[in-house]
C-alpha cells in the first residue's frame, strides 16, 4: 500500500 516498501525496510 502507501509506500509499503519504505515501511518494510524500517524493519
UniProtKB/Swiss-Prot annotation:
Binds 1 [2Fe-2S] cluster. This is NADH dehydrogenase [ubiquinone] flavoprotein 2. Core subunit of the mitochondrial membrane respiratory chain NADH dehydrogenase (Complex I) which catalyzes electron transfer from NADH through the respiratory chain, using ubiquinone as an electron acceptor. GO terms for cellular component: mitochondrial inner membrane. GO terms for molecular function: 2 iron, 2 sulfur cluster binding; metal ion binding; NADH dehydrogenase (ubiquinone) activity. Its EC number is 7.1.1.2. It is found in: Mitochondrion inner membrane. Signal peptide: none annotated.
